[in-house]
């Protein structure tokens, strides 16, 4: 069993999603958004750090998964996004959580089956995969999709390791 916290970083809205994985079964534990309504960036970063720290304290995750930085339309946006990611990662590292990063395209490919999927498609598949009564908010859905991606990637890696070990022992041909 593992609890995974997924984070969709943003300097104004940071989405989070928490799921439990038992074997191949995924269970929804919680999701939402950290909204920073102040104007100055240092205060927003402080709120993101405090919010992520509070979520970690509440859910006690085993793994922390976050979206990688993509090339934003302007440099200022990319820098702010990078700083928001940074404080979220620091919150995880301060709690000694292993941090995993996934590209947005990989997340969409894993959850929807198309790397260029629309937000509405991600929301629908997250709802379906986690058996939710309604589509989660867009940023929370992205965070849940990041957590789901971590489950799939780590499960595939574990299966590959077991196969290699069995091959080395002469059990597979």
Swiss-Prot record:
Binds 2 Mg(2+) ion per subunit. GO terms for cellular component: cytoplasm; Holliday junction resolvase complex. The active site is at 8, 67, 139. Its cofactor is Mg(2+). GO terms for molecular function: crossover junction DNA endonuclease activity; DNA binding; magnesium ion binding. It is an enzyme of class 3 (hydrolase). The keyword Cell division does not apply. Signal peptide: none annotated. Mg(2+) 2 binds at residue 67. It is found in: Cytoplasm. Belongs to the RuvC family. PANTHER family: CROSSOVER JUNCTION ENDODEOXYRIBONUCLEASE RUVC (PTHR30194:SF3). This is Crossover junction endodeoxyribonuclease RuvC. It comes from Salmonella arizonae (strain ATCC BAA-731 / CDC346-86 / RSK2980). The lineage of its organism: Bacteria, Pseudomonadati, Pseudomonadota, Gammaproteobacteria, Enterobacterales. The gene is ruvC.
């Amino acid at each position: 069993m593992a609890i995974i916290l997924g984070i969709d970083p943003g300097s104004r809205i940071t989405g989070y999603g928490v799921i439990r994985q038992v074997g191949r079964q995924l269970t929804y534990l919680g999701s939402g958004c950290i909204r920073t309504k102040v104007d100055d960036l240092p205060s927003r970063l402080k709120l993101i750090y405090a919010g992520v720290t509070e979520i970690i304290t509440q859910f006690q995750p085993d793994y922390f998964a976050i979206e990688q930085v993509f090339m934003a339309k302007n440099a200022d946006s990319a820098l702010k996004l990078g700083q928001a990611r940074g404080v979220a990662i620091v919150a995880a590292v301060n709690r000694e959580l292993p941090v995993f990063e996934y590209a947005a395209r990989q997340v969409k490919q894993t959850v929807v089956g198309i790397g260029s999927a629309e937000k509405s498609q991600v929301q629908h598949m997250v709802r379906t995969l986690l058996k939710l009564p309604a589509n989660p908010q867009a940023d929370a859905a992205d965070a849940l999709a990041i957590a789901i991606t971590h489950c799939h990637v780590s499960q595939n890696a574990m299966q590959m390791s077991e196969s290699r070990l069995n091959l080395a022992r002469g059990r597979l041909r």
